Amino acid sequence: TGTIKRAQDKAARALGADRVFFVTNGTSTSNKMAVQALLAPGDIAIVDRNCHKSHHYGMVLAGAQPLYVEAFPMTEYSMYGAVPLNTIKQALLNAKADGRLDRVKMLDLTNCTFDGHIYNTRRVMEECLAIKPDLIFLWDEAWFGFARFSPFLRRRTGLGAANAIEAWMHDPKSVAAYEKQQAELGKNPSNEVLLKTRLIPDPRQIRLRVYQTNSTHKSMSAIRQGSMLSVKDVEFHTVEQQFKEAVFTHASTSPNQQLIASLDVSRRQMELEGYGLVANAIEIAIAIRKAVNSNPLISRYFRVLGADAMVPAQYRQSGFKDYLDPSANWASALKSLDDDEFCLDPTRMTLVCGTAGYDGTQFKGILANEYNIQINKTSRNSVLLQSNINNTRSDVAHLIRVLAEIAGEVDRGLTQGGANAKKTFEARVKSLMTDVPDLPNFSHFHPSFRGDAGAKTNEGDIRSGFYAAYDAPGCEFIRLGDPEIDRRLKAGPELVSASFVIPYPPGFPIMVPGQVITQETIDFMRKLDVKEIHGYDAKEGLKLVRIEALAKIGKPKPGAAPKLKAAS
C-alpha cells in the first residue's frame, strides 16, 4: 500500500508487467515465492536441472514434483548451456502420452544463464502453449534485468516475449495461421512430426501466464539483495490469495527501507537513462572481446569465446558466429536475436585461462588479490567477465593492461625456463583443457520417490527425498574413495542420495535428494579439483538413504499423533 505500492506500479509499467512485487531477500526468495504460490503437492514442473538451487528448494517447499530436463553440455569448458526446445517439447509430449499433462503446471527456466545463453523466449512459450495452452512460465532472469531497456535484447526477455504474444493473439491473422498449420498437420500428427514443426498455438485457447524474476542489485543500481518479481498472468485472480501467502511466508516483517527505496531509484534510473547505459555496457563488452582476441601477446594465452564456441551450430539457425567475425554487423546480430534458438548475452564474456596454465579458481584469485578485479564465476579452465551499466573505458584499459602483464609473465617463464618449463606447462594445459571430466546428467529418482510417476516421465517426489535425510538412523555415509561405492554400483543395492550435492564450480546440483547415483556422477566427483562442494563432507562421505529406510518410504509410521479435541 501507499508509497511502496505506487513504486511497484511504476516498476510494472517500466518492465511491461501487470504487477511487480519488490523483494528484499534476493531473487532466491523471489523464485521460492513464485514456486510456492503457483505449485501444490503433486503438481509437476518441468525444470532445468542446472537452474539455481532456489528452484530446487522451492520444489521441496511446495511438494511439487520436478521433471528435470537437461541443457546441452559444453564439456570442454565444464559448463552447461541451455535446454533445447525439443527436449522441453518431448517432456510435454511424454506427459501427454502418459495421461498426466493436466498435472504439468509450470516450465521453469533460467534466462539468461550464468554463462550468457539466452532463450528464444517467444518461440519456447508459443510452442509449449501449442501443446498445453495454460502452462505457467517462470523465467529466472536474475542476471538479465537490464535487457528490458535494450531494444535489441528486450525481445528475448520473458515479459518482452509475453507482450509480443499478447499482441499477436489479438491479430486476426493469428487464428488463420493456427488453422492453416492444423490443416497441414492433419489429425493426430506423430510426436516426430510435432518435434520437427515450429508449432503455432491456438490464440483462442491460450491463457498467458508469465512470471519473471530479476536481481535488480546484479545488473542495475539497487542495494544488495534487491529483487523484483514481475507478473503477467490472466489467471492471477485465481492465485492471488496463495501468492500473498507465499509472500508472507518468505518476506521479512522488518524490511530494509533503504533497500526498497533503491529498487525504486533503480527503476527510475533505467527508465530515464537505461537505453544509453545498456548500450554502453554492450559497447564495453565488444571492446573487451576485440582487445583480448586481437592482441598478439594476450591471445597467445587467453581468448574470449564467441557464439560459435558457446552455442552448437544446430541452435544458431542464422549462422551467426561471433561479434568479432568480419562479416558480423548489427543486422546479422539482430537476425540472430530473432531467429536463433539460443544466442549469447554480449555483456557476459567467457575468458579461457586454461591455455595460460591457470584453472578458473586460481586465476580468479590472482585477479582479485593482485589487481582488484572481481570475478563472480569460474569453471575448470575459464572465468566469466561481465560488463555492466557502471563500467567505463578506463575499466577496459585496466583489464587489458593486466591480461597483457600476466601473459607477459607466462611468456617469459616459458622462454627463460627451458625445456622442462615448457614440458610442465604443456602438461598443465593438457590437464585443464583436454583431460576434463564428462558432465553427469540427471539419472532418475529411486522408485520409492516415484509414486505414481508416468512410464515416460522422470518426475519424482523430491520433498520426501529431502526429509528422508532427517531420519538419521535411516541414512549412511560412504566415502568417495571407498571400494564399497564401486561394488554397489556394479552389484547393488543402488546408491540413493539423501541430500543436494552442489560443487562450485560448476554450481549446479549433481545430486538431488532421492536421486539414484550413477557411475558417471561418481567419476565426475572423483575428478573434481574444487574446494567448495555444498552438501558433501569429505571426512564423512556421501550421505545416502539406507535400503531399509527406502522400503519404508510412504508407509504410515506407528504411533501416529492422536487427534486433538477442539477447545471448549
For the regions a protein language model found, what residue spans apply to each?
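Gly-rich Lys/Arg/Thr-decorated short loops/hinges at beta-loop-alpha junctions or inter-strand turns
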Residues: 10-16, 67-76, 345-346
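Short glycine-rich or small-residue beta-strand-to-loop segments that form or flank ligand, phosphate
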Residues: 21-23, 107-110, 350, 384-388
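Conserved PLP-enzyme active-site core in the AAT-like
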Residues: 30-40, 44-293
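Conserved phosphate-coordination/catalytic loops
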Residues: 2-5, 25, 79-86
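Short amphipathic alpha-helical segments embedded in low-complexity Lys/Glu-rich regions
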Residues: 26-29, 75-76, 383-384, 420
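General small-molecule cofactor/ligand-binding pocket signal
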Residues: 21, 67-69, 376
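Non-catalytic terminal extensions of PLP-dependent enzymes
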Residues: 1-5, 12-13, 158-185, 198-204, ...
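Short loop-beta-helix segment that forms the pyridoxal 5′-phosphate
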Residues: 12-34
